[in-house]
Structures are given as structure tokens and as C-alpha cells.
Regions:
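Short, flexible helix-loop junctions that flank or precede catalytic/ligand sites
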Residues: 1-265
Length: 265
């Protein structure tokens, strides 16, 4: 008490790739190579969301020619142009808020906008409108899983704008990638993730905000590129990358995970 303290987060100067992070490159890049739409990277604080976004932009920098504007608080990774042109903006230094920075970015001819965090209704609506007008928006959101992300995002919208926002979300959302970092058997951290792709009937469920149907759809892993957290955790256990005890601690359906692991054994 009464003394100075600091919390330090070391940031690697090198942009990590998907293999180094044990992330599913195919799905993430399938979304990120689209010319427009909204991609949400979700998870709790410290789950590696910024690093996942950095890996996506690093891959795009090697393979495509795009103008990428980032809005971050704070800037973590510095991108060196290879094939892409980067304009990095820090909240509080270069622009007063995410919403103001996002509106300004739309006048700067971006192909891709990285939005460090969606925190309020103005930012959320503007992100959806940016997607609608031909931009790819990559954004983070604090949430426990894919359906929790949808609920939190929807709750940002005022009641009078909710139907309009849900209609935009149904047409512009490409997918949600939700992740958690788990202690692995190799004394490192490894991501466990859940994937929801906006394909098939998902857009109708989004328009009606039918979270029960979306949750059930996600748990049918393998359908339209979806992966449930349960399936991902079971795979990590089968590969002996995490222990069953750790997997259960991070699973929202531990009973189902135990039954699934018994089937694998």
C-alpha cells in the first residue's frame, strides 16, 4: 500500500505467424482475404486477441497489397510495410476515441481497418456501416464465447436502433473467432478456440437474435467451418497438449467434455 507498482506486458518485436501461435490459418485467412465484411476476434483480457490480429495482418502483408489502418489503445505491434501500406493510429495520441478515429479512417481510402476494441454503440454501428460500404473491418470484443460476443455486441445498441443493427450484422458479419489461452503440457500457453461462420441459416438467426439456434449450430462442429470450444479442447487433450484437468477448467460444458474424452480413450 502507498507504493508504486507496474504491470508490464512484453511484446515481441517480430510479428508471430499462425504456426507459432497454433492458430487455424485457413479459416482466419479465408475471412481476412474478403474485400469487405466484419470479423470479430473475441476473448477475455489477456487471451491473445491482439496477437491473433497481428498474425493476420502479418500474413496479409506478405501476400496482398492493401492499405491497412489500425486504431489501437495502445499500439502494440509495429508493422513494417512489405506489400501492404500501414497507417497506425493510437487512441489518445492520434485520435481521441475509436469512434472518431474510425469515422476519420473512412475518408483515408483504407482497404482494411483494424479496430482495437468495440466499446460503445457508435463504434459498433460505424464498424458495421464501414463493412457495408466495402471495407474489411477486423475488431476485438471482450466476451466468453461466440454467442456471448453476439449478446454483448447487441446490448451496445439502443433499443430504437437494434433491428437496424441486427440487419446490418446479419449481412456484414463474416465470422467470430473466440479464444482462450491455456497452460500447455510444454510449459507454454496454447489457444483453445471456437469458430462461428456466418453461412447458411446463421444470417437469419442473427437477424432474429436466436442465440439458442446459433449455440446449437456452433456445437455441431464441422458444419460450415464451425468449431466448438468443446471439440477444440478434446483435440488438445488427444494430442496431449493440455491435460484433461486444465481442459475442464476452461470448458463451459465439463460433463460433455469428460464423456467426449472417454470416447477418445
Amino acid at each position: 500500500l502507498g507504493t508504486l507498482a507496474a504491470v508490464l506486458r512484453p511484446i515481441n518485436a517480430n510479428i508471430p505467424n499462425f504456426d507459432e501461435l497454433s492458430l487455424p490459418a485457413d479459416q482466419l485467412m479465408r475471412w481476412s482475404q474478403r474485400s469487405s465484411g466484419l470479423v470479430l476476434i473475441c476473448g477475455p483480457t489477456g487471451a491473445g486477441k491482439s496477437t491473433t490480429l497481428a498474425a493476420i495482418l502479418g500474413q496479409l502483408n506478405q501476400t496482398t497489397q492493401r492499405h491497412i489502418i489500425t486504431l489501437e489503445n495502445p499500439i502494440e505491434y509495429l508493422f513494417v510495410p512489405e506489400n501492404c501500406w500501414f497507417s497506425q493510429r493510437e487512441i489518445g495520441t492520434d485520435t481521441p476515441s475509436f469512434a472518431v478515429g474510425l469515422r476519420a479512417a473512412l475518408r483515408q481510402s483504407p482497404d482494411i481497418i483494424l479496430l482495437g476494441e468495440i466499446r460503445d454503440s457508435e463504434t459498433a454501428i460505424t464498424a458495421l456501416q464501414a463493412s457495408e460500404t466495402g471495407h474489411l473491418v477486423l475488431a476485438t470484443l471482450h466476451s466468453a464465447n461466440t454467442t456471448d460476443a453476439l449478446e454483448r455486441l447487441t446490448n451496445l445498441f439502443p433499443a430504437a436502433e437494434r433491428n437496424f443493427a441486427l440487419s446490418l450484422l446479419a449481412s456484414e458479419l463474416l465470422g467470430i473467432f473466440s479464444q482462450k489461452l491455456l497452460p500447455s503440457t510444454k510449459d507454454t500457453l496454447i489457444p483453445a478456440y471456437e469458430i462461428l461462420s456466418n453461412e447458411g441459416a446463421v444470417s437469419d438467426w442473427l437477424r432474429d437474435l436466436d442465440l439458442a439456434a446459433i449455440t446449437e449450430h456452433v456445437h455441431r462442429s464441422g458444419v460450415d467451418g464451425n468449431v466448438s470450444l468443446l471439440t477444440c479442447l478434446a483435440h488438445l487433450c488427444a494430442e496431449e497438449l493440455v491435460t484433461p484437468e486444465v481442459a475442464e477448467a476452461y470448458c463451459d460444458r465439463p460433463g460433455e467434455l469428460r464423456r467426449l474424452l472417454r470416447g477418445i480413450e
